[in-house]
Amino acid sequence: MLSYLTRLTGRDREEFYDDHLAHFLTFNAGAANAGGFMAFQRYTSHMTGIASASADALAIGEWQLFLAGLIAIIAFVSGAAFSAILINWGRRKNLHSQFAVPLLLESLLLAVFGFLGDWMQQFHAFYFPATALLLCFIMGLQNAMITKMSGARIRTTHITGMVTDIGIEIGKSLYWNRDPAYSTEHHVRGDRKKIRLLMNFVALFFLGGLAGGIGYNWSGFIATLFLATLLFLLAIMPVLQDIIRSNR
């Protein structure tokens, strides 16, 4: 188990471990996204909806809503940028934890959100922007980490690209390869393994959303601590490796 956790978020990457980690992170993104919606009626993991809502707000002269959306996008971009900085710094230092550190930071930020969420509700003017921006930053942090780790093969915080790729592969699978002018090596073939993988991600995002919604209704912000603990367990082994190595 310890070896598995070390390889899951460690420096040396294999497609097998990238895919396994993406399963955990997709569930986490779905849960955090749903929990955020239950808390303040906004989704924070996908920027498409936020950008569209900001454009609508600008069109009807709702400047506050427009600025809120713009700042949310900036928070997401900032999270992605900070993740890239951490990973590139870790690569420069040849750390085992170059990918684990952004996850560990995400874990700590989710824990802060879980512990302080109820307390922050008393500050109405501060509560919504602070929590929304924190979750947008967290989602940017996570999405950039798995994107860099997998060489842009996997993203976990939104499923638009996933269902698009599923449709593409289904279309390729259904293509009628009957043209005698083309040999079998040029036949169009769908990637069934990719379809299964992406369908798993979509299902886990949905299940994460279900768990996040139920968890928030049942226990409020404290439900976020489950996600924080999950990410902490995923990230801690490579970090401990680097700590032990630095003390030798």
Label every PLM stretch briefly.
Residues L2-R248:
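Alpha-helical transmembrane segments of multi-pass membrane proteins
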